[in-house]
Design a protein with these regions (language model features):
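Rossmann-fold dinucleotide-binding core
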Residues: 92-173
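Hydrophobic beta-strand scaffold residues
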Residues: 32, 48, 110-112, 196, ...
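A generic structural signal for well-ordered alpha-helical segments
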Residues: 25, 104, 148-149, 189, ...
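Rossmann-fold NAD(P) dinucleotide-binding segment
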Residues: 52-110
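NAD(P)+-binding Rossmann beta1-loop-alpha1 motif at the extreme N-terminus of oxidoreductases
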Residues: 1-61, 84-85, 120
Length: 287
């Protein structure tokens, strides 16, 4: 029997994130039906369905949080999705999300994709900073706004079903770059009498001070002029590459996290972009 209620939903997938999502809805008073390949992972209070098909049939709102796009398709394949609101919180690419939207729609369902900007411990925690990008069917988003706001903040980025995935991966990519820089920095100080615990606050403060550069990059991309307002141009920055590389060599640290970006900087200068900021590198990546 299907439940048409804004206080009931189904969750497919009970990994760390799926379990955290489920617990947040249970704590908010929702009736949650769950399915997982290992039913023993079900949080206390959830109703465990024997099959994915049974779980989907139970509620109109179905949240999917599985390993990848292939797992989503394998789980939903052959299940009647007529009248179902499928909210996919599985990490995917823009193209995968768009294709999955068509796949779900062709089977009678409505589709909303999501990109979770949080780790499981942040889910359901007030003021944790957690939020989810959503994109896809506007009416689905509006109809389920209350339920979707329970685990984390909501940022709806448009009707294109691929946009949530793109925002998600773009920000994760920026984070990967930050992690790479931090790894290199900690490696540099590793041989010296410098406490990582004392160094960490300096790194955080410096990264925060530099983070605003993104606004300048965005403005330059919008204008198409990469030289306006530049204080340290690309040619000047490239001259420091040698110092960074020599320091790494002296400290016995591999520079493999730095050299790909340095190569792009040098290439842009060689092509005449020496007076630009690092924004010019964006064009090289888009070619």
């Amino acid at each position: 029997m299907s439940v048409y209620s804004n206080k009931a939903l189904t969750v497919l997938g009970l990994g760390d994130m799926g379990s955290a999502l489920t617990r947040s809805w249970l704590a908010a008073g929702y009736a949650v039906t769950v399915w997982n390949r290992s039913p023993r992972r079900a949080p206390t209070g959830a109703t465990v369905a024997a099959t994915a098909a049974t779980a989907v049939a139970t509620n109109t709102l179905v949240v999917v949080c599985l390993l990848d796009d292939a797992a989503v398709r394998a789980t939903l394949d052959g299940i009647d999705l007529t009248g179902r609101d499928i909210v996919n919180l599985t990490t995917s690419t823009l193209a995968e999300a768009r294709a999955l939207s068509e796949w779900i729609t062709a089977r009678g369902g409505r589709f909303l994709d999501g990109g979770i900007m949080a780790v499981p411990s942040m889910i359901g925690v007030a003021d944790s900073g957690a939020y989810v990008f959503y994109s896809g069917a506007t009416e689905l988003h509006e109809a389920n706004a209350e339920a979707l706001a329970v685990p984390a903040g909501v940022n709806y980025v448009g009707a294109d079903p691929g946009f949530a995935a793109l925002y998600d991966i773009a920000l994760l990519s920026a984070m990967w770059g930050m992690f790479a820089g931090a790894a290199h920095a900690f490696a540099l100080i590793g041989k010296e009498d410098i406490s990582p615990m004392a160094f960490a606050p300096l790194m955080v403060a410096y990264q925060q001070a530099m983070a605003g550069y993104a606004y300048g990059t965005a403005a330059q991309l919008a204008r198409g002029d990469y030289t306006e307002g530049v204080e340290s141009n690309l040619a000047m920055m490239v001259t420091t590459n040698g110092t960074l590389l020599r320091t790494a060599a002296e400290q016995g640290v591999s520079a493999e996290l730095l050299t790909p970006f340095m190569a792009l900087m040098e290439r842009r200068v060689a092509e005449g972009g020496g007076k630009e900021s690092t924004t010019g590198v964006v064009d090289l990546l888009r070619r």
